[in-house]
């Protein structure tokens, strides 16, 4: 699993992360401490603690989280997966132990979701946001510039989790003749069709990142197989650099820029 960077740790210092951490830890903490006797109804001399079935469920949760960690784009994405699956497991475990605490826990999850939504990435980036046919017109007009384009929708969690990665790439690889851009195909569905990106949730094509050179697409992730299903791709920074050959493209465009400057001199 990726080690969190300092900027990611700072981004986690929000009410969203604080309250979701409490919800994620609520059941194992309450069930394994003296709070258990106050929260759950205990019959007779029965000891209030985590039983064998609950322990199995928690172990299964850890296995799922470890598996999800391999598919996370970055540390923040992984943390959100921890919150999601821990709360789902918590709902089941609370209701299984006692219906009243279970209902209260579900209501608490709903309240936190409404009052403290997941923060949107607002860090530094060098990204051009296109509307309508602007992207197609720019590709046609300026063939000397390589464009790395992310097709996204505002409602897709995967698109939100990819935003920090795309922003970081734009900071590292932007040149006057190599640029990064975004197009919301949720708003501009016809442009999604033009660039062969299916915005339907079941297509699993969101987000899609394409590289355009001389107005032609030279790379795309995720790839789409013969049955029109997207081949899963983890949009980590390292995977994107390798899949789109960004280092070589960057050096190539940098050399062209330098040669053009010398020629003009």
From Swiss-Prot:
Motif residue range(s): Di-lysine motif: 262-265
Alphabetized UniProt keyword annotations: Membrane, Signal, Transmembrane, Transmembrane helix
Gene Ontology terms, MF aspect: disulfide oxidoreductase activity
Any one Gene Ontology cellular component term annotated for this protein: mitochondria-associated endoplasmic reticulum membrane contact site
Alphabetical list of InterPro entries matching this protein: Thioredoxin-like_sf, Thioredoxin_domain, TMX2, TMX2_thioredoxin_dom
Keyword Signal: yes
Domain of life: Eukaryota
Transmembrane segments: 97-117
Membrane-side (Extracellular) residue stretches: 33-96
Membrane topology: Single-pass type I membrane protein
Domain Thioredoxin: 126-230
Spans within the Cytoplasmic topological domain: 118-265
Pfam families assigned: Thioredoxin (PF00085)
Leader sequence residues: 1-32
Subcellular location: Membrane
Chief place of localization: membrane
Entry note about domains: The thioredoxin domain lacks the 2 redox-active cysteines, suggesting that it lacks thioredoxin activity. The di-lysine motif confers endoplasmic reticulum localization for type I membrane proteins.
Name this polypeptide is given: Thioredoxin-related transmembrane protein 2 homolog
């Amino acid at each position: 699993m990726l080690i969190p960077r300092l900027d990611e740790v700072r981004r986690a210092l929000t009410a969203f992360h604080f309250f979701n951490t409490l919800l994620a830890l609520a059941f194992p903490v309450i069930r394994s401490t003296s709070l258990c006797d106050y929260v759950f109804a205990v019959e007779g001399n029965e000891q209030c603690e985590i039983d064998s079935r609950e322990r199995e469920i928690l172990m299964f949760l850890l296995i799922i989280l470890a598996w999800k960690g391999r598919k996370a784009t970055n540390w923040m994405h992984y943390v959100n997966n921890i919150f999601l699956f821990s709360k789902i497991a918590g709902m089941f475990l609370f209701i299984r132990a006692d219906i009243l605490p279970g209902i209260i826990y579900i209501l608490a999850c709903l309240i936190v979701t409404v009052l403290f939504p997941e923060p949107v990435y607002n860090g530094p980036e060098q990204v051009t946001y296109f509307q309508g046919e602007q992207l197609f017109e720019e590709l046609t007009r300026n063939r000397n510039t390589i464009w790395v384009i992310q097709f996204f929708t505002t409602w897709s969690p995967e698109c939100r989790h990819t935003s920090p990665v795309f922003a970081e790439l734009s900071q590292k690889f932007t040149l006057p003749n190599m640029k990064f851009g975004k197009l919301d195909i949720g708003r501009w569905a016809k442009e999604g069709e033009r660039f062969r990106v299916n915005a339907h949730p079941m297509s699993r094509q969101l987000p899609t990142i394409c590289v355009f050179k001389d107005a032609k697409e030279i790379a795309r992730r995720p790839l789409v197989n013969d049955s029109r299903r997207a081949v899963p791709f983890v949009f980590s920074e390292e995977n994107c650099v390798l899949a789109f050959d960004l280092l070589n493209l960057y050096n190539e465009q940098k050399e062209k820029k330098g040669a053009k400057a010398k020629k003009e001199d």
